[in-house]
């Protein structure tokens, strides 16, 4: 099964996550199929907290990819900010 989930990067006490498409059997920080965005939970000021390539996410979801709970909530956050910006 293909999943869209987070993989951790960054330094100790300063997490940074890539939003990736991967097979569910792969390790958390293992091999991935495609990187579709990133998430910075400690973003401050003008830094962007979540960046997603919505076209690619929609493509993978149409082709059967499952979203993890955290990625689903980030997707809602991005769509909400895009709606208020438009």
Swiss-Prot record:
Gene Ontology MF annotations: structural constituent of ribosome
Gene3D superfamilies noted in UniProt: 3.30.1320.10
Keywords: Ribonucleoprotein, Ribosomal protein
A GO CC annotation given for this chain: small ribosomal subunit
GO biological process per UniProt: translation
Pfam families linked: Ribosomal_S16
Keyword Ligase appears in the UniProt entry: no
Family, as annotated: Belongs to the bacterial ribosomal protein bS16 family.
PANTHER family per the UniProt record, alphabetical: 30S RIBOSOMAL PROTEIN S16, SMALL RIBOSOMAL SUBUNIT PROTEIN BS16M
NCBIfam families: S16
Official protein name in the record: Small ribosomal subunit protein bS16
Name of the gene: rpsP
């Amino acid at each position: 099964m293909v999943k869209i989930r987070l993989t951790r990067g960054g330094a100790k006490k300063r997490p940074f996550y890539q939003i990736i498409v991967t097979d569910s059997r792969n390790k958390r920080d293992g091999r991935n199929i495609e990187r579709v965005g990133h998430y910075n939970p400690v973003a401050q000021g003008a830094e962007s907290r979540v960046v997603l390539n919505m076209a690619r996410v929609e493509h993978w979801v149409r082709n059967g990819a499952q979203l993890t709970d955290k990625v689903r909530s980030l997707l809602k956050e991005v769509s909400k900010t895009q709606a208020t910006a438009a």
